[in-house]
Every structure is written in structure tokens, then in C-alpha cells.
Amino acid sequence: MERVEGTTPNEAAAAVADGEEPPQGPPALDDDVRTGAAGGNNLAEDEAGAGRPRRRWFRRAALALLIALLPLLTAETALYVNYQGDPAQGTHTRNRDALWLGHAWVDGRKKDADVTALARRLQGTGIRDLYVHSGPLEHDGTLPESVYPRARWFIDAVHEKLPGIRVQAFLGDVLAGEGADGMVLEKPDTRAAVVRSARQILDTGYEGIHLDLEPMPSGDRDYLTLLDALRRETRSRDAQLSVAAHQIDPLPALHTVFGLFTDHPKWWSQEFFGQVARRVDQIAVMSYDTAQPLEGTYGGYVAQQTSLALEVTPPSTDLLMGLPFYWESNFDHWGHAETVPAAVRGVRLGLSRTDADRSRFGVALYIDFAATEADWRAYKEDWVR
């Protein structure tokens, strides 16, 4: 006799003799057992059931990530497309370019032979202005004369070996913010001290003031007030006033959104950029440290920045676009992407599309002590020609 689960052979025979039907199989599973609950014995279904929520979670997470990245991917694609096309003929140097120089030129480290080498390097280029670091300013706006002891020597040496090239004093400081010490432009005494410092260093023989105060918030009225005062001073002495400018919002009001998360401004509104440009003789856009991951997107970004700046810079002001004459590799500046060839091509594309015949236009090279032979070659071959 076939063994029936839960019944011995003798019990089964006795049940038949009494006229009873023996059990024909295991009892039906109740709902708890079917679902594996309360001591159920369905391990395979248990595991399958546990896997389904995990798969759903991963799908939802992937979808959420895609939705979050979609605006960024769209923007990067637009920048890459902006890098396509051919620059117009003639979009090359207008002989109004500039070069940022380090502090070694005015503190005694550089010698006559260095000036001779610099003159040889700049021969046949479009560079007309040198922004030589002569500060920094103190947080109260003052400038110790001890920080530029060899300025007069350098100015005279440049005039001798590079006639026609102007030497401007590159002055800057960090602005107070995010709990850090720095210059407070809201203080009238500080602004007055900056003007006195400009007057003091112009007495040394510099032909202009190049101001770089960072990080400068978009719309800062105290900054505009300072520029007005400096412009009166430089004009009275037939000197130049130039500034290093933040990049312009690549998307409308992006500086406002960015400001919700940090007190360290990166962009200016296009309107504020124009307000600054109308107060100076030269405005140099720091069009590097963009965090762009590819040459194509970086070049497209520079093309966009060039167009945005051209739209609001008056024809009487020199507009210069910064070129990255240095190598770094970090989140803000990917060295493989932010190259001189990509920047020059971007500048030419933006110029071609917006104001190809603009005469008061150039590029500014940052910075002499970090530049490579490849940087100089790209500048000369792609921009100077």
C-alpha cells in the first residue's frame, strides 16, 4: 500500500476496515503558508519576492538620476553644438591682446636677461598690455610700497626693449565672505584707500590700473562706486583702468540660483557685466576654470561667453577674453579640456557670430610663469597668424 503522509500502514488499514476514507494527501495550504508567512515553507517564492522590490528600487533610482541629469546633459550638448562651424575670415588678433605677469617681475627676482627673453617672446604677437602683479592690496585698501620695490626698473626696461607696450599695475584682494577675512567694499574708507593706492602706484610710472577683486557678487553697487572713483583718477592722469571680470550667466539668472547654495559668486548677470564694462577702458573675462569636461564643451562655452560679452560691452571699451596659459586637473579646471586651441577657436566663433568686425577686441593670456611652449604656439598659430 502506498504510504499516506501522516498515517502509518496499520492505521490506514484500520480506517478502511471501519469504512472510513483515509486521507488522500496533505492538507490544503492556508493563505499564510502560501505567502510564506507565519512558518510557511516556500523559500523560492520568498527569495523571488524579496528580489522584486530591489529591482524596482534600482529602476526608480536610475530614472530619478536620469531626470536630474537631463538638464545638464542638454546644456552640455548645446555647448558642444555651439563649438561647431567655421570662424569667419579675419577673426584674428587686433593687436590689443594682454598678458598677465607674476609678482617676480617687480620684487627683485627677475633680471635684465629675463626682460630680454620676454621681449623676444612677445615679438610679432598682438600683445599691447602687460598686467604685472604689484599687490596684493591690504584688506583695508592700502598698498605697502615694499611689495613692488623693482617696479620702476621693470617699467623702464619694458619701454626700452618693448616700445609701444603698456605696463599696468595688477592689484587685487580677496573680498570678505563665507566667514573669511577680506576686503569689505561696503566701507567708504576702504574704497577711498583703494583710490589712494592707485594714485600712489601710478606715481611709480605705471600706465594703468588692472583691478581684480574676487569673489565679486553680481550687482554689487559698492564695486560700481569704486570703479567710478578710480575712473576719475585714471582719466585725470591719462592712464588706463581695466578689470578682471567674472563669467556671465550661461543660463538666465544662474548666479541667483548658485547663490542659494554658496556665498562664493561665480557668474555675473549680463546686465551687471555691461554696467562694469561701461566704467572701464578694458574688461578681461576670466573665461577659464569652467569645470567643462571636454574640449568641445569648453570651446562652446567660450564661444557663448564671447557672444554674451560682446552684446553688452560698448564699442569704446576693449573686450578681452581670457586664455588658460596653465595646466591644472581638478573639478574646476580639467587640463585636457581647457586648452588654448579650444579657447581660441571658441573666441573666434563667438566673435564671428556676434561682431566679426569689432576692432576693440582681443585675448588675455593667464599667466606667464605657468605657460608652456604649446600654449604660446597655439596662441601664435591660431590667433596671431
Q: At which residue positions do the language-model features occur?
A:
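N-terminal Lys/Arg-rich, disordered targeting/topogenic segments
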Residues: M1-F58
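Extracellular glycoside hydrolase catalytic/binding regions
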Residues: M216-D220, A239-L310, D332-L349
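Hydrophobic membrane-insertion alpha-helices, especially the h-region
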Residues: R60-A78
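Aromatic-capped interface at the extracytoplasmic side
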Residues: T77-T91
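Chitinase-like catalytic core of GlcNAc-active glycosidases
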Residues: Q89-V115, R121-G124, D129, H133-A277
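Substrate-binding cleft of secreted/luminal carbohydrate-active enzymes
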Residues: A78, Y288, E311-R385
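Flexible loop residues that form catalytic
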Residues: G135, E214, Y288-D289, D368
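Conserved, mostly hydrophobic/aromatic
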Residues: L130, L211, I283, M321, ...
